[in-house]
């Protein structure tokens, strides 16, 4: 796709796309470890993880599209925001270097607790369903809890990544494309690691 951007839009657009892709990938790679800890904590079998991440990434792309659209509109109206986003990009770079590995575990635990305040959460899976019933009342299954945390953590990461990428490019198409391909690549990366863990248990 990067080659298509270079041919269709020129080297400037190619540079913006590639920069956006690398920023998004470096910031969002934490999602892979959050997903792994989350599925382990909630005992979600690998065969159901595909369903959770399909809807999780679909929702993430919708939310990113909204964030990018709003951010681009704000920059068009208030040009000084570009400077603010540039400063945010520097701060984000520092945060990548000083990243703490336990943050993902904390976010996953808090996310499940937050859903528990909204509605009852069952401890048992009900096939691939997101909802079940406990005592005649509707309740979330661990699958929905996992989906909720996937979306919640993506919103948290998007708050970092979207302003950082908008500091590099204010072209919504390029920003969204770089986000989309980086996020879709994470799903493939996760299942590559998950399948490896199934075969080589010492990786756990």
Predicted ranges, named:
Residues 1-204:
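Multi-pass alpha-helical transmembrane bundle typical of ion/small-solute transporters
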């Amino acid at each position: 796709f990067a080659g298509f951007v270079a041919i269709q839009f020129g080297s400037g657009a190619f540079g913006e796309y590639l920069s956006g892709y690398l920023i998004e990938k470096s910031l969002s790679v934490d999602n892979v470890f959050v997903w792994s800890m989350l599925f382990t904590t909630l005992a979600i079998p690998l065969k159901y993880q595909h369903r959770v991440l399909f809807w999780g990434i679909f929702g993430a792309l919708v939310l990113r599209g909204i964030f990018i659209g709003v951010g681009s509109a704000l920059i068009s109206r208030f040009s000084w925001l570009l400077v603010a986003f540039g400063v945010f990009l520097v701060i984000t770079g520092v945060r990548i270097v000083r990243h703490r590995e336990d943050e993902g575990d904390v976010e996953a635990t808090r996310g499940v607790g937050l859903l528990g305040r909204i509605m009852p959460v069952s401890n048992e899976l009900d096939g691939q369903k997101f909802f079940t019933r406990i005592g005649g009342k509707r309740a979330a299954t661990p699958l929905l809890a996992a989906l909720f945390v996937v979306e919640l953590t993506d919103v948290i990461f998007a708050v970092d990544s979207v302003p950082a990428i908008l500091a590099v490019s204010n072209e919504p198409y390029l920003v969204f494309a770089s986000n989309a391909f980086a996020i879709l690549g994470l799903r493939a990366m996760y299942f590559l690691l998950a399948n490896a863990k199934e075969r080589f248990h010492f990786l756990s």
